[in-house]
Amino acid sequence: MKNWAGNLRFGAKRYHTPHTISEIQKIVHDSDHVKVLGTRHSFNNIADCQVDLISLESVVPRISVDPTNREVTVGAGVTYGDISTFLRDSGWGLHNLASLPHITIAGAIATATHGSGSNNGNLATAVTEIKWIAPDGSIVAHSRECDGGDFEGTVIGLGG
């Protein structure tokens, strides 16, 4: 498997394409080292892993809007193209957009991908809660409200 440009080859022993969150939980639980691979829009090997790579391309995109709290909830595999269309059709929008519709929202958040304009915060600045799968397979939630300053370190990380 190669990156988007075809100039990097991924070296993972196993490549997983789960369809459900429970399948992802099992893979994470059973693996010694795992990374989630987005749309492979990486310019270097930081996204690579020597053991298990998980692709979210087969997980059904989940997007919901809570108009009362003015919040949008998305699954990790949702792309900018998915969310832009959904939000437009719902009368909503994002404060900043990356230029590539095929990259995932989770990937853009985790790498602090910039969008348009130097005065606009990246998408990670709008995240209020994040859920992730711990090594034991459990789902862990962190929020800006409950975790304060530590929250930013949870949201942005390059996947070392």
Place the predicted regions along the sequence by residue.
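N-terminal regions that are enriched for targeting/export leaders
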Residues: 1-5
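Glycine-rich N-terminal segment of FAD-binding domains in flavoprotein oxidoreductases
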Residues: 6-102, 112-117
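FAD-binding subdomain of flavoenzyme oxidoreductases
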Residues: 108-160
